[in-house]
Amino acid sequence: MDTMGRHVIAELWGCDVDKLNDLSFIEQVFVDAALKAGAEVREVAFHKFAPQGISGVVIISESHLTIHSFPEHGYASIDVYTCGDRIDPNVASNYIAEALKATATEVVELPRGMGPIQLEKPKVKVL
């Protein structure tokens, strides 16, 4: 293994506003994303803000998945961090982007535990 983990940071734009503000939907999507990636779910905690927006985390044996949604902007900020090399965090990230109906994504993947971080240009995809 070359890294201690892989950390995907994704900006999701043009998301379905109603889905971004649906606590049950977001929670289920994140649990499903973790399972589809092959992760083992340990704990789930999500909070809906008034008047809108959701923040949450799915703790997995391999690390975590997080979201901060901004329905008023059709935007979600997500992180998927997996330790080791058994699970591809992009599987979960892509599943979440599709479920939220994102029309554009910007994704950066960071290798973790390798010393100074060297950022590559983000991968931008217009869907």
From Swiss-Prot:
Its cofactor is pyruvate. GO terms for molecular function: adenosylmethionine decarboxylase activity. It is an enzyme of class 4 (lyase). GO terms for cellular component: cytosol. Keywords: Autocatalytic cleavage, Decarboxylase, Lyase, Polyamine biosynthesis, Pyruvate, S-adenosyl-L-methionine, Schiff base, Spermidine biosynthesis, Zymogen. Pathway: Amine and polyamine biosynthesis; S-adenosylmethioninamine biosynthesis; S-adenosylmethioninamine from S-adenosyl-L-methionine: step 1/1. Its EC number is 4.1.1.50. Belongs to the prokaryotic AdoMetDC family. Type 1 subfamily. Heterotetramer of two alpha and two beta chains arranged as a dimer of alpha/beta heterodimers. This is S-adenosylmethionine decarboxylase proenzyme 2. It comes from Halalkalibacterium halodurans (strain ATCC BAA-125 / DSM 18197 / FERM 7344 / JCM 9153 / C-125) (Bacillus halodurans).
